[in-house]
């Protein structure tokens, strides 16, 4: 039997977050930063990103992401020409970042791609590159 497993790069440890902006800048130049309900806690990252990116847009997720919010923010990211997503926060923020990366690269809204309750269309393009900076530990 032959198995193949490929995972994303995982960097962890004390001080690992210092390299986030430089890593993201190797993936793109126009960043969409997704944060939790208190974006001020991420000012250090916003400043780092602005020092190495051509443009940085910040989106704060104040509660569980709703489909209309994700669709609207993905369209705004597309219009802004965002080419990399950085998400810093808990599970909802990371999930929202993944959804935004996929939708910004493919167009349409959430229901275009949702199975069962939507059209269930497959993505035509790879999602935008994404850097996840989890700030909580959980089972998800």
PLM features: residue spans?
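ATP/NTP phosphate-donor binding region
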Residues: 1-84
């Amino acid at each position: 039997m032959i198995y193949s497993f490929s995972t994303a790069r995982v960097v962890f440890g004390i001080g690992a977050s210092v390299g986030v902006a430089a890593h993201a800048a190797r993936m793109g130049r126009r960043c969409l930063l997704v944060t939790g309900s208190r974006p001020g806690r991420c000012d250090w990252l916003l400043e780092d990103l602005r020092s190495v990116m051509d443009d940085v847009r910040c989106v704060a997720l104040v509660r569980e992401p709703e489909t209309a919010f994700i669709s609207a923010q993905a369209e705004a990211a597309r219009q802004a020409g965002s080419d990399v997503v950085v998400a810093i926060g808990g599970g909802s923020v990371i999930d929202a970042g993944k959804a935004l990366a996929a939708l910004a690269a493919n167009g349409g809204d959430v229901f275009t791609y949702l199975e069962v309750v939507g059209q269930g269309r497959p993505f035509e393009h790879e999602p935008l590159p994404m850097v996840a900076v989890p700030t909580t530990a959980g089972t998800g």
